[in-house]
């Protein structure tokens, strides 16, 4: 499942949120216009209009103590808009709290957090987020996370773990062949696997695998 599609998982809860006022732990006696602003932000988020949603969420975040779910929404918006540092700023603190949500909703936040750290080349921070996502996502969503984990370990020159994750990613891609450009991805993974095997074989060439993670 593509990241954009994955991010919509768990948003069925918004239907009930749209009819509610700002939660008690956000504020008391909220003015009506801010309730409307929250409703609009949620509607934009649900419609994948992340830029518009983020503008409204930021304004609310400046004025109220938003709950953990809304902060996670802000983090997801930032991730979708390539604002990776800000995404981590919002998502990192709420990760311990997302375990109370439905598994697939958790996977949305873990993936957005992991990808944000990955894009910032913070591979050690990305690894546990990808691993937690693997525990709660559907099987047909695991390939991308396994693929990224392969690169996380490769960049750390942990060839054995990189090899294991690349091989697992290839198996999942082959089984759930849904991804656009799958043939090119599989060819790349094959090259990465061969490169990692050369690194783990003392009798083989010292050539390193390519570090292109697209």
Q: Can you say where each PLM-predicted feature lies in the sequence?
A:
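Alpha-helical segment of the N-proximal tetratricopeptide repeat
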Residues: 33-59
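Terminal, low-structured helical/coil segments at or just beyond the last alpha-helical repeat
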Residues: 168-214
């Amino acid at each position: 499942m593509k990241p954009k599609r994955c991010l919509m998982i768990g948003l069925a809860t918004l239907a009930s949120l749209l009819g509610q006022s700002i939660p008690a732990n956000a504020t008391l006696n909220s003015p009506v216009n801010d309730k409307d602003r929250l409703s609009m932000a949620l509607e934009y988020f649900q419609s994948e209009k992340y830029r518009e949603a983020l503008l409204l969420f930021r304004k609310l975040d400046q004025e109220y103590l938003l709950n953990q779910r809304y902060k996670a929404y802000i983090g997801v918006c930032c991730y979708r808009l390539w604002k990776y540092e800000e995404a981590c700023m919002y998502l990192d603190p709420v990760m311990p709290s997302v375990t109370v949500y439905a598994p697939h909703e958790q996977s949305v936040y873990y993936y957005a957090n992991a990808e944000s750290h990955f894009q910032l080349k913070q591979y050690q921070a990305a690894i546990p987020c990808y691993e937690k996502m693997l525990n709660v996502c559907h099987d047909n969503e695991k390939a991308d996370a396994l693929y990224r984990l392969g690169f996380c370990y490769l960049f750390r020159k942990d060839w054995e773990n990189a090899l294991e994750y690349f091989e697992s990613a290839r198996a999942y891609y082959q089984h759930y062949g849904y991804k656009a450009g799958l043939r090119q991805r599989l060819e790349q993974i094959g090259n990465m696997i061969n490169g990692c095997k050369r690194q783990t074989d003392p009798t083989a060439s010292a050539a390193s695998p390519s570090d292109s993670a697209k």
